[in-house]
Structures are given as C-alpha cells and as structure tokens.
C-alpha cells in the first residue's frame, strides 16, 4: 500500500484547492467536531501522543524513537501503540522485528520495535492495556491524535520547518487532517523539526494559543559511510526532500534522486531500474531506514542488492537539551494528577 499527497497541497492555494473547497468544508466540519467533542477512553498509564496536523511526513517516527530512548534512560519501560499503516493485521498484534515483514505490520512499527515493544490494533485502548500486561509503564501513541480513540496526557504535534502545513487547507483541498484551529485546541505543544520558514504560520498560531514551541533537528547517525561519496538517493516516504538533504548534511554528494510514494511497495522492476541507473553513472545507492525495512522483508529482493545498499538513519536532537526530559516529566505529572484527581 502506498499513499501520495498531491503536490499542489504544498504550494500556495490555486484553482484546485478552490474547486475542492466545498468538499474540504464538509470534511473539516466532521473531523473538527469529532476531535473537539470526543471524550477518549483512558488507561491507567501515562500516555504521550506524537502526532501531526497533516498527512505526509513530518518526523513522527524519529520523534517517537527519541522519546522511547529518553524514557528508557529514565528507568521507565515504554511501549508504543500504533495503527500500523500499510500492514494487514486487523486484530491485536505484538510486533516481532525478527519475524514480521513490512507488508504485514507496516514499516514504521518495525523501526519502532527496535527500541520498544510495539502493539498494533485499531483499538488503541486494547493495545495499551496489552502493553501494560507486559510490564510497560509509559505509553507512546504513534499518531492517533485526530482519531481520539485513546486519551493522551500530553499531545505533541510535529511539523516540518520547511513544509509547514502546506497550503493550510483541509483534505481534499490540502493536507490538514482537520481545521487548524480545532487541532490547536487539543494540542499541548508544538515540535518544529529542521530549518526553514515554512512553519512560521503554524508557529505563530501556537504562540497565540499559548502552546509551548520546541525545536529539533534530524542528525545523520551514520555519516562516516556517506561522506565523500556520490549517490543515487531514493526514498518512498512522506517528505523525500528531507532525506536527500540529510545525505548532503552527512557529506554525501547527491547526484540523482528517485522519489516513490509514501510507504511504497517496491517491485522487481523498480530495483532493476535503480541498479541500472546507479551503475551507468558510477553511483552508490542510498535510502532511508524505512525503505530499507520494507526492502529487507520483501520476498525476492536480491541479497547482493541489500548488501550494497547504504542506509542513512537519523536521530532527533532537541535544540534545548532539557526539552525531552521536561516533556516526559509533564506527561507523568499530568497522569498522576488524572489518577488522583
């Protein structure tokens, strides 16, 4: 399964956004009301929601990983609740990174499961309760902000600094999952990732609403294997340009790029095409950790292709060194107040 946001969503509003405005009004009315009026069920564990305002990539996965690591460093045992985009499980499933494939559980849960227990289920309460039975004492909800299926003690909304919220319109006229004003009412803090001024509008809105604003960067974690080499970089993620920039930040020369749809399921012809293109120009092949997870668990992918494929992973670093710990403390404090209130 793959999804791809129309390119016009990320530009200034044009005739297409205008033509879709009536449908967007209806969608926004329904999604906004559901978000504002919902009273999500609660679990007896602290819950941090890592979400975003729009469809498409903003940096939720590295953010969730950063908080899982931070919780572990503080002596907690975090568990992650996910819907498992792109997978085909309809019930409750504990992700096993040693046996599960991306086609069954999704690429993001496989990455997250390297750092903490991940439970997949459309019923997020059931998933959280199952993680509690395994000994988890802190829940990270990967996405799920708009669905309101599990109460979050703290909702951190992630936005990309360069893309922001695109044209600011609601689906299908733009990338917003619900009207920004409605989403902001339920937001506890904003996390702006990267450099750029594309998120200036949403930052101003968050400031006016009195929401804390944090800043962070995605740092390449494997620069040594990338620097000084010429690459054909390819990615099937929500914001591939962010990945290409990360390769450059790591010291690599990006000669060619090839972008696929988000969560793209690669076919043998895709692999042959990438290999041929790289061979003709004398380039190395490099991709994201998410894409590598999908490729590595796909049947029929040549082992020699995987062995030569470079993977650039990234870590999230807050600009303020105390930010991550402060958010974790706030989640726990709010949970305790809820429990004893």
Swiss-Prot record:
Residue numbers binding ATP: 54-61
EC identifiers of the protein: 2.7.1.130
Coiled-coil region list: none
Metabolic or biological pathway, per its Swiss-Prot or TrEMBL entry: Glycolipid biosynthesis; lipid IV(A) biosynthesis; lipid IV(A) from (3R)-3-hydroxytetradecanoyl-[acyl-carrier-protein] and UDP-N-acetyl-alpha-D-glucosamine: step 6/6
Superkingdom, natural source: Bacteria
Lipid metabolism recorded as keyword: yes
Keywords: ATP-binding, Kinase, Lipid A biosynthesis, Lipid biosynthesis, Lipid metabolism, Nucleotide-binding, Transferase
One Pfam entry name: LpxK
InterPro entries cross-referenced by the UniProt entry: LpxK, P-loop_NTPase
Chemical reaction(s) catalysed: a lipid A disaccharide + ATP = a lipid IVA + ADP + H(+)
Main EC class the enzyme belongs to: transferase
GO process terms (BP): lipid A biosynthetic process; lipopolysaccharide core region biosynthetic process
Stated family: Belongs to the LpxK family.
Name the UniProt record assigns to this protein: Tetraacyldisaccharide 4'-kinase
Organism: Brucella melitensis biotype 2 (strain ATCC 23457)
Gene that this polypeptide is encoded by: lpxK
